[in-house]
A protein has these predicted regions:
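The feature captures the beta-strand-to-loop junction immediately N-terminal to the Walker
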Residues: 40-42
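Helix-to-loop junction immediately C-terminal to a conserved catalytic motif
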Residues: 55
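Q-loop/switch helix immediately C-terminal to the Walker
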Residues: 86, 91-106
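Conserved ABC nucleotide-binding domain
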Residues: 109-128
Length: 139
């Protein structure tokens, strides 16, 4: 996927229940690459469930999913990324080591985020909060 291309992921008519408790009903969400989307709501209203459905780690009772307008009946893990609330990269790793551990080439990170060129040997704990979140998003 080219960093400069725009793509749209849509999920529609999302339904999710646990027993008799309806968690999500008729939810629609569209997200575009290169942007940030916030999902807001009270505790327990289904935000995390929606993200897990979007990323394929939770199966909805029903949902429709389109990528760039093309309907998909199966989840495409290679085309969706999800950044969880808590960080997951150990602070003692360097940026370069994290990339190697995930099997990702250094040049690909630089194509998306050129400012990381000066951070190759930097420990994760020394990165700013924003730099850590960018790296976690990339991984």
């Amino acid at each position: 996927m080219n960093p400069s291309e725009k793509h749209i992921l849509e999920i529609d008519s999302v339904e999710l229940s646990f027993g008799d408790r309806r968690i999500l009903s008729g939810v629609y969400l569209a997200v575009e690459t290169g942007g940030v989307t916030a999902v807001l709501g009270r505790n327990g209203c289904g935000k995390s469930c929606l993200m897990k459905i979007l990323c394929g780690s939770l199966r909805a009772d029903f949902r429709s999913m389109r990528i760039d307008g093309v309907w998909h009946d199966r989840f495409r893990a290679d085309e969706v990324r999800y950044l969880a609330q808590q960080g997951f990269i150990p602070g003692w790793l360097t940026v370069d080591r994290a990339l190697r551990d995930f099997g990702l080439p250094w040049d690909d990170l630089l194509a998306w985020f050129p400012l990381f060129g000066k951070l190759r040997g930097t420990k994760i704990r020394a990165l700013s909060g924003g730099e850590r979140r960018i790296l976690e998003s990339y991984l």
